[in-house]
Structure formats: C-alpha cells, structure tokens
Amino acid sequence: MTALLPFYAPFGLEAGLDEAGRGCLAGPVVAAAVILPRDFHHPFLTDSKQMTLRQRNELKRLVREYAIDYAIAEVDAAKIDEINILKASILAMHLAVDQLTHRPEHLLVDGNRFYSYPLTPHTCIVKGDSKYFSIAAASILAKVAHDAELYLLDQEYPQYGF
C-alpha cells in the first residue's frame, strides 16, 4: 500500500506539478499539472521513475479518467538553451497551469525551486512525487509525454539512440 498523501492544503482545488526531461541531453522539458478529487487514491500511484513503462501507461489512463483537470506543456530545446534548464522547467510548469480549465487555489510543486504563479500560493516539496498523489500523477503524465517526444526523436535520428 502506498504512503502518499491525498492533499497538502486543507481546502480548495490543489494542482500537483512535476516535470520530466531535466537530465536529458536532447529534447524538450515537459511539465504536467494535475488536479485530483480529494478522495482519489490508488495503491500503485507513486513517482513515475519507480514504475515500468506498462505501469506508467496504465496509470496515465487512470489519471486522465479521474482527474478534475490536467494539462501538459513543454519547452523546446532552443528555449532551454536560451534561458537554462531550471527556468525552462519552471516555465513549462507555468504553461501547464495556464492550460488548466479549473483555477487551482494552491500549487504543490515537486522540487525546491519555483517562481510564484500569479495569485496562486505554492509549496515546493522535495521528492514530492513520492509524497503526494497529485504530484505523482503529474510525474506520470510528464514522463509519458516526454518519453513519447524522445521516441519521435529516435525515429527521426536513430543514430543517437534516444
């Protein structure tokens, strides 16, 4: 059974944010924002890096089905080179929040750095994807989307072994 927590704030809509692709040498950085119902839980939902491809794909389907709202955004390699990977990761998270149709009242961010999002308080949680359901869900959506981008790059440039 998982030890993840359902939410951080005691009330309101809370979006979990995470990214994938910060350690990559190629491709975009991808971020996801996920708002889950307060009663959502799943015994196998955890940090996407701890899952198999099959588990991630199954949980991606489950998250998309049960989420109140979710969004995925990316920042391409050219922009990463222009502003640096940390700023690009945070930008991707902001872009994901921008795409949500529901306005969260609180943002739970995986990691220790984030630039304030307008009119929405946030809390940074180191290793948040192994502590909170919404961040773990965002971790899965971001990782699956990033892996899909790398697959496309591999098809176009097989000599690099993405």
Report the location of each language-model feature.
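RNase H-like, Mg2+-dependent phosphodiesterase core
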Residues: 1-162
